[in-house]
Amino acid sequence: EYCRETPATRRPHQAQGHEMEMSLIMAKLSHEAGASWILSRSGYSGIQKYAQTWTGDNNSSWKSLQYDNTILASMGLSGLIHAGCDIGGFWGETPDSELLLRWIQNGVFTPRFCIHSYKDIPTEPDLHEVTHPKHFKSIQKFMQLRTELIPYLEEQSKLASEQGIPIMRPTVYDFQDEPETYNQSFEYIFGDKFFIAPIYQPECTSREFYLPGKGITWTHYFTKEEYQGGQQISLDIGLEDIPVFTRD
């Protein structure tokens, strides 16, 4: 862990974890009908066939919020279709209300939604009304939205398992004929339906990005305004929502 040293062959910790994951999923499948889901802290080449993992011990910062999306999209391309991150950050300072709100808003549209922290950092959902009263109603709204998206996530999970299409993926995956998507590091596609342009800077009042999909009509999920794909757009941003677009 933490890449402090290169392990010797007599200490193949990651390979051991891989064998444990494989054994566990085989045992579950032999005793239980239906889908099985395993979360593992360690992994090795081929883990995507048996278990899922997360981005690791991130810190409570805007930079972590920004780059977790890049990591998750890359993990999706590697077959880890249910990857997630510790929303709010695992270690470091307690996230302020705006950072936690933005992280939750973004996390709703990731495969694995988990608010998790270390020791005395109070980010647990049952504490938000006390620890983050300023944005509690907005946090509550997005937590409810995540619940409403469960059927969609189940559908996309099945599709990803059967066809290998990542749930969370870079925009270039879907729009390879549009050069503007080649350098889109932070915007991403979430399943068949959503395009997400997350907010990863404090006190953000506007967001400019390329909306892919020439010939596609996108609908802003919250304002219901329609936009044509294949163009650069700029939106005014408030604290109540983030740029999320849907297509039919």
Model-derived features: positions:
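Catalytic-domain carbohydrate-binding cleft regions of carbohydrate-active enzymes
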Residues: 1-242, 246-247
